[in-house]
């Protein structure tokens, strides 16, 4: 199949700004969204192309959308809205397998047969497709993406898996900024993550030409917990560096 033969790095990806105008209470309201969409690889592509899964019509395509200039997100769509909260600060759309009442994304680890397959598909779609689109959206928005990192955990197994996969994807992308060399973008895996209040220590390490990145507490905690950063600016790290 052409999909299987395409190198993963060459699979279709698209970024777009979408403006929506609608009438509300006699006035025209305008909302703008940044939208990232892609066809994914990994387990999602393998499942979609497996002959034994042909009847399920799995499609490894998904997208995420972030409203620009206003808070939003947390909604899930399978082209039509699904009444489930994802805990993510972006909206998510994909070819998900839904529960029988179409009110939730199918999930569960204690299933067998078709139910287990549906659950595995949803996780693969979130990890190999949605998370890739999400990380690329963060990269495209640059500084404007500060409030779009997936910091909230506990929305459910599927969404926690997606959240973890976003940090995995983010590790290798220049999403953070260090003051080293006058300021430049850097991949999380190469940085020393400091809290905003670590000013004096961070400045000292910058003088030693370490790529220190100052982060807000919630993002710092999430990046460190996900093992996304190269090192954490801590007394232990500083002692080890100078000894």
What feature does the model see in each segment?
Residues 1-243:
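GHKL/Bergerat-fold ATPase module
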């Amino acid at each position: 199949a052409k999909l299987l033969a395409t190198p993963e790095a060459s699979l279709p990806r698209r970024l777009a700004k979408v403006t929506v105008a609608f009438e509300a209470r006699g006035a025209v309201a305008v909302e703008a969204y940044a939208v990232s969409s892609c066809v994914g690889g990994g387990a999602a592509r393998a499942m979609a192309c497996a002959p034994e899964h042909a009847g399920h019509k799995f499609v490894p395509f998904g997208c995420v959308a972030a409203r620009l200039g206003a808070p939003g997100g947390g909604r899930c769509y399978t082209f039509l809205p699904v009444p489930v909260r994802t805990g993510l600060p972006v909206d998510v759309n994909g070819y998900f397998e839904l529960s029988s009442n179409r009110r939730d994304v199918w999930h569960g680890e204690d299933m067998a047969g078709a139910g287990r397959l549906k659950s595995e598909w949803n996780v693969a779609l979130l990890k190999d497709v949605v998370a890739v689109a999400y990380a690329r959206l963060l990269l495209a928005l640059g500084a404007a993406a500060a409030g779009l990192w997936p910091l909230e955990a506990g929305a459910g197994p599927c969404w926690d898996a997606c959240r973890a996969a976003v940090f995995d994807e983010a590790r290798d992308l220049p999403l953070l900024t260090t003051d080293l060399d006058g300021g430049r973008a850097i991949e999380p895996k190469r940085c020393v993550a400091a809290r905003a209040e670590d000013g004096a220590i961070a400045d000292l390490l910058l003088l030693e030409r370490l790529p220190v990145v100052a982060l807000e507490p919630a993002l710092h905690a999430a990046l460190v917990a996900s093992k996304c950063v190269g090192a954490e600016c801590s007394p232990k790290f500083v002692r080890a560096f100078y000894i």
